[in-house]
Amino acid sequence: MNNQRVAIFIDGSNLYHNLKRFDIKTKFEDIIKRVETIREVIDIFYYTALLDKSINEIKYGEHKRFLDKIKKIPNFHIVLCNLRKVILPDGSVDFAIKGDDVYLATDLIKGAYEDLFDIAIIISGDADF
């Protein structure tokens, strides 16, 4: 195995929605194991926001169980971002995670500056990256 230190940065919401849109099932453990065959994974950062329990208790419970499961993965860090209510043009209400890409980019730059890793892997479905 190569001694290069790898940090993985995951844009949770965008990844989730794109995997769902294309009906792709994956486990984070499998992704990490694949990278670990050639590199040392030192940290995994997952950027998301907690769903509003009062809006949809079922989705909230599913999301919470998912977060509880992935935070048991060694060196896995959940970074909580802001959830904002958005009024759509038709008057309906939706919710959007705000600031996740800013948190991710800031952590990426800070970690590179502090020499915390040699390689950064960004996992996202966001066109911003």
Regions found by a protein language model. Give the residues of each.
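Domain-level signal for Mg2+-assisted phosphodiester chemistry and nucleotide/NA-binding surfaces
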Residues: M1-A96
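Nuclease catalytic cores that cleave nucleic-acid phosphodiester bonds
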Residues: K72-F129
